[in-house]
Amino acid sequence: MPGRLGGSRRAAIIAIGVLLGACPVQAQPAKPAPSRPNIVILLADDWGFSDVGSFGAEFATPHIDALAHAGMRFSNFHVAGSCSPSRAMLQTGVMNHRNGLGNMPETIPDEHRGKPGYDTVMNHRVVTIGELLQAAGYRTYLTGKWHLGSDAARLPHARGYDRAFSLADAGADNFEQRPIEGLYDKANWTENGKPATLPKDYYSSRFVVQRMIDYIGEGRASGKPFLASINFLANHIPVQAPDSDIARYSAMYRDGWTALREARAKRAAALGIVPAGAAMVTMPTTPDWRKLDADERAAAVRVMQAYAGMATAMDREVGRLVAHLKAAGDYDNTIFVFLSDNGAEPTNPFASLRNRLFLDLQYDLATANVGRRGSFSAIGPGWASAASSPLSGYKFSAAEGGLRVPLIIAWPGHADIRAGGITDGLAHVTDILPTLTELAGVAGHGGSWRGRAVEPITGRSLVPMLKGGAGSVHGDAPLGYELSGNAALFRGDYKLVRNLAPTGDGQWRLFNLKVDPGETRDLAAAEPDRYKRMLADYRTYAKANGVLDMPAGYTADEQINRYAFEQQGKPRLIRFGLWVGAFVLLVSGLIWGLRRRRRAKSGWALSRR
């Protein structure tokens, strides 16, 4: 697509820069340390803001919490509202409309397909952290969910990873090699670009950690430092966990999601993650726990127990990895980054009778089986509101519950990073790459890579914040965001936000996140000048990044349903129709044959008379 990076248009775009949210700021490489650090990225899937013990969760995450106490917690860290855009920004340090993920394959409207920035895969105009560190002499490994492209030229082994065992899809079963039924026809696991088969004792969190431990061990003789990116499937739909982990929480969650949301808010405030007494909204999509019947409550309690068990199972694997690195003598010289790709998942896959009937044919949906092998479950909007506590909204929306997630950065053997520190300065997922390259003493690409122009890194190094010397590296600079029509503009302590249906009404609202992280008090009328200025900033950002308006009537949920029908529903209907047609032809042929025989016999009998 030469128009984006060639000729006068390229010059104009880079001159504008990604003016608000994409201002090219290249970290200055630090002097190489005697021994360059290893880097471990722990990417959780669909974990809400308070889904970690050190951010307010009631379930056990002791190993992730240990990293938090060894490093720094970022309580004002933002990603995209859904997975692929966040993952591409994490990989490249480039905003999503410039890295190809202006939207995802499952949610893009037909009108946007093929437009600049709307590739629905990570494009080749960006450079990954794997490519940068690989070129600098690092061993580079990735295990788990990829979801940035499924063809050979876009899988991890072609994007800077020496070895990779990855899932190309948005999600899959956690106990067997099985896709999310109705969305994909198979679970597309590959190793180094070739189709791979999972072991019989597979459980997702255990497997992706063990495969990474194997990779690290097999490459140790080289003496090179390593980048280990572990992309967990937990806690994406389907929510599944080992029986023992579910049983651990058998006495919990009987008071419902509203009580849990309130309890988490109090814990988060006590931990210093949010201001004391921060107000919360009651989301209109949250069901009234008191109106559920006994069976509905039992099913809801069970799925949250499974969700908690799934998180604890993942945390245990983090602990196993850390123990391995300690035993190998690597722990003190390893930088750990823990984050989630977006907020908690609110989807209720059983909301429609059609989906319920389909899933009932594919899975064992009995309450006693929730979370186990052969089950399909999701926490829905009620528990998602608790997972996002005390924020408003969840995955897919541009509200804080969709964009703000836990971030932990630790380097246990490095005194410059404040152990146990918490910062509420604004940080963004594009900031991770320049942070890690600076800490590793690796130069960035400066917009040119192997003789060709590429998108400049738009994130800013968080090293000043890690050292305790800056409130936010973004200062008062505008930082823009858009996905599926849901949009935001951050500037200092303030946020301008718009959510389309079904999570919003399409109106812009203004909030001071410093004192109101729950987005409860719209300041648009009280601060009209700031509102107008930030709206102008957003429009500049949208124009500079090629953001397209959504078609009338668009909703991400409906688009996902269309995608599922096109990918699975229509082919299944066609196959069913062919089967029925073949059956009808067969029966018709048999009937015709029988009638012909009868006629033949009748004719023979008449001829004998």
Segments predicted by a language model, with ranges:
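Short, solvent-exposed turn/loop segments enriched in Gly/Ser/Thr/Pro and often Arg
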Residues: G53-F59, R73-H97, L101-T107, L142-R154, ...
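Active-site regions of oxyanion-processing enzymes, predominantly non-cytosolic
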Residues: P32-N38, L90, S150-N174, S205-V281, ...
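C-terminal cap/loop subdomain of S1 sulfatases and analogous C-terminal strand-loop tails that border
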Residues: D162-R163, L167-A172, R373-L403, A410, ...
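Bacterial N-terminal signal peptides
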Residues: A11-A22
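Active-site segment of extracytoplasmic enzymes that catalyze sulfate/phosphate-ester chemistry
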Residues: F49-Y141, R159-R163, D169, D173-N174, ...
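C-terminal accessory region downstream of the catalytic core in glycan-modifying enzymes
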Residues: M72, H147, K194-P195, K200-S205, ...
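Long, internal low-complexity/basic segments
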Residues: P29-P37, A44, F49, R73, ...
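Histidine-centered active-site microenvironments of extracellular/periplasmic hydrolases
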Residues: A152-G160, Q240-A241, A323-W411, R418, ...
